[in-house]
């Protein structure tokens, strides 16, 4: 059994491959519901396979921390939450990766408000921190450090931090500071309760280590930062960097050696790989996909922008041809956010670039049509309750959703969460919803139900080993439709 001074882990909802489909992972944002918890967890976040308590794949962010600490000479072990006890005896530091620890993210907040329960991802994070293994390690003097994309939420839960003995919360890109913090702990030095890595501390391309263990579903970062500057987003505060092909292929080889033969290209806008502005680079993007497809069995994207797609339909079609040599479809998360040109101009003026912000609804319709024709299935987000939103803005968004009824997609409305340059603004809460907001939520639900059976067929086509799951998802979808329509009646009254 591997002993180490640093133990890394995360909660049960993050240590899963979601049956090889990232879309399925969105089920962790929902609260407990009409499906028994044991069966719901099997459907939406089955436990990752392990070898001696160590996961065969782990969240990419956790793998990056692991790689950086190993690079700096620490002894490190990454384990699943169910196997902490076997590995924790020698650990002086327990590092926990978080995504949405309190369910304060947009999707979780919206579902929790509508269903009036705490989401699974928050429930399992809190179960991890209250576990016997963690508490016993703390009694023996182990220090508890948390980080990851969900680190910002701890600022809103100071009492939780105190009561659960969290010694340090690390927010931001940590490569250049994590070793110093961990070394200080081992030397018995004081450390801050909260540490937010500044832009100056962000690593250069050469300072970001390659992962040394496989990432869940083959997720590979191809770049960091974003040039669009939307006011509601944290990522725009980071410098834009694109990784060279060689680095991406090296990390793919790590995944492949560990038995992970799929690849999810991760960036805030995959369509802008290699570009220094909002115009796609045809040559670099095409070459990237040719290289990646030679080295994996399937590909997906984490995010892309509709403006980049609409600005170069021929390039997108070419990428679709490359990708669909081995698969029928692929997916990505895409931010629509609003159908109002006025709101687009105020808080996300560059999101439509190289088009004008006033053209945003037309950009969305054009981009979504191109995605549909090329078998890209987007999970789209809308933001409900944006600052300075008026009734006419909500009506514009409703008109846009209606125009998208023929586009194969999921459209998910999310309550506004104060992040980025808008972090000083107030949260949007269910009590603030007006009649139009409620109608918009119901409209999105009906859009999603219309496409759900088709998406289930696509998601599990050709996968004999999960074919039986398709029928369970169909049953779940059918019951969810009935339950949601009951909620719709209550909401609209």
Predicted regions and their residues:
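Conserved SAM/AdoMet-binding glycine-rich loop
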Residues: 8, 253-378, 384-389
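Flexible glycine/acidic-rich beta-alpha junction loops that bind and position SAM and/or redox cofactors
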Residues: 94, 102-106, 264-277, 310, ...
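N-terminal pre-triad scaffold of radical SAM enzymes
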Residues: 3-14, 200-236, 245, 249-257, ...
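Catalytic cores of alpha/beta
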Residues: 155-164, 315-319, 387-403
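Radical SAM enzyme core and accessory elements
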Residues: 2-32, 36-38, 74-78, 226, ...
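A solvent-exposed, charged loop/short amphipathic helix patch at secondary-structure junctions
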Residues: 21-52, 101-128, 347-356, 433-446
């Amino acid at each position: 059994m591997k002993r180490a001074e640093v133990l890394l882990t995360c909660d049960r909802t993050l240590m899963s491959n979601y049956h090889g489909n990232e879309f399925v992972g969105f089920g962790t944002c929902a609260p407990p519901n009409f499906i028994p918890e044991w069966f719901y967890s099997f459907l939406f976040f089955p436990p990752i396979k392990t070898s001696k308590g160590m996961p065969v794949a782990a969240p990419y962010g956790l793998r990056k921390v692991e790689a950086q600490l190993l690079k700096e000479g620490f002894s490190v072990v990454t384990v699943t939450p169910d196997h902490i006890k076997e590995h924790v005896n020698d650990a002086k530091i327990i590092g926990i990766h978080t995504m949405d620890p309190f369910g304060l993210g947009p999707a979780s907040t919206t579902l929790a408000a509508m269903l009036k329960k705490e989401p699974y991802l928050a429930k399992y994070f809190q179960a991890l921190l209250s576990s016997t293994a963690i508490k016993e390690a703390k009694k023996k003097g182990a220090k508890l450090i948390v980080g990851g994309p969900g680190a910002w939420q701890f600022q809103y839960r100071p009492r939780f931090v105190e009561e659960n003995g969290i010694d340090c919360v690390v927010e931001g890109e940590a490569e250049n500071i994590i070793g110093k913090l961990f070394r200080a702990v081992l030397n018995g030095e004081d450390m801050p309760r909260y540490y937010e890595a500044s832009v100056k501390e962000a690593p250069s391309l050469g300072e970001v280590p390659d992962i040394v263990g496989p990432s869940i579903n083959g997720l590979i970062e191809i770049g960091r930062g974003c040039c669009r500057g939307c006011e509601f987003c944290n990522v725009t505060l980071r410098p834009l960097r694109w990784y060279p092909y060689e680095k991406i292929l090296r990390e793919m080889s790590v995944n492949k050696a560990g038995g992970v033969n799929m690849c999810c290209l991760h960036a805030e806008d995959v369509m802008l790989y290699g570009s220094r502005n909002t115009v796609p680079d045809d040559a670099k993007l095409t070459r990237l996909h040719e290289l990646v497809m030679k080295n994996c069995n399937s590909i997906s994207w984490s995010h892309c922008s509709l403006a980049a797609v609409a600005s170069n339909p021929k390039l997108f079609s070419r990428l679709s041809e490359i990708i669909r040599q081995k698969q029928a479809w692929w997916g990505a998360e895409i931010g629509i956010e609003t159908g109002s040109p006025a709101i687009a101009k105020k808080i996300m003026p560059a999101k439509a670039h190289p088009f004008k912000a006033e053209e945003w609804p037309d950009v969305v319709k054009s981009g979504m049509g191109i995605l549909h024709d090329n078998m890209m299935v987007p999970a789209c987000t809308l933001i409900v309750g944006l600052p300075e939103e008026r009734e006419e803005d909500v009506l514009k968004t409703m008109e846009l959703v209606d125009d998208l009824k023929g586009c194969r997609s999921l459209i998910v409305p999310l309550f506004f969460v104060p992040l980025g340059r808008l972090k000083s603004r107030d949260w949007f809460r269910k009590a603030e919803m007006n009649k139009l907001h409620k109608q918009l939520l119901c409209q999105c639900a009906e859009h999603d139900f219309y496409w759900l059976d088709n998406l289930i067929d696509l998601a599990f086509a050709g996968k004999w080993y999960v074919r039986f799951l398709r029928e369970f998802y169909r049953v779940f979808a059918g019951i969810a439709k009935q339950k949601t329509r009951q909620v719709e009646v209550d909401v609209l009254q």
